[in-house]
């Protein structure tokens, strides 16, 4: 399914997306679930998980094309969306980078798994690479592996 939106709406979505440091799909999903009053934690978590899967698939496609900058951003999106899914299950919304980082610390401590924090830092490097384009290909490849491990650990800890 695809959704066609007026240019004015798309520009507003992109503006909010940039201001919140999220991807446009998340803004659109949030608006739809709020409009439909489907604000229960499990629905929100499912949306974030689906976005995480989509972004990881996109990252892999960009890797195949040799576009490591876009692959970096999509992998970051996959990690942040899976973290938001975990938070949503608890009734928590993470709307800033600071909130994401604090929640990672909470999860790592609760599970006694400090590797979660380190893997999250790899995702953060990928996010920065989207803006700076300074990571060599090999680091992007390895950091995306870290993101996959991060996602796996979050899923296993449920």
Could you describe each region identified by the protein language model?
Residues 71-72, 78:
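Solenoid-repeat scaffolds in large eukaryotic assemblies
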Residues 39-61:
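Short, positively charged interaction helices/loops
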Residues 87-158:
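Long, charged low-complexity segments
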Residues 51-55, 81, 150:
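Amphipathic, well-ordered alpha-helical segments in soluble domains
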Residues 2-5, 13, 20-33:
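Short amphipathic alpha-helical segments
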Residues 35, 82-86:
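Hydrophobic recognition helices of helix-based DNA-binding modules
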């Amino acid at each position: 399914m695809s959704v066609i939106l007026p240019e004015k709406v798309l520009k507003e979505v992109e503006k909010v997306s940039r201001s919140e440091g999220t991807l446009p799909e998340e803004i659109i999903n949030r608006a739809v679930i709020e409009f439909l009053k489907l604000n229960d934690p499990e629905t929100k978590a499912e949306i974030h998980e689906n976005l995480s899967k989509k972004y990881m698939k996109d990252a892999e496609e960009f890797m195949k094309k040799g576009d490591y900058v876009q692959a970096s951003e999509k992998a970051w999106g996959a990690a942040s969306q899976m973290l938001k899914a975990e938070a949503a299950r608890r009734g928590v919304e993470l709307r800033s980078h600071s909130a994401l980082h604090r929640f990672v610390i909470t999860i790592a401590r609760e599970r006694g798994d400090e590797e979660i924090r380190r893997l999250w830092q790899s995702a953060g490097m990928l996010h920065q690479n989207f803006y700076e384009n300074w990571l060599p290909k090999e680091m992007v490849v390895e950091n995306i592996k870290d993101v996959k491990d991060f996602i796996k650990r979050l899923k296993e800890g449920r």
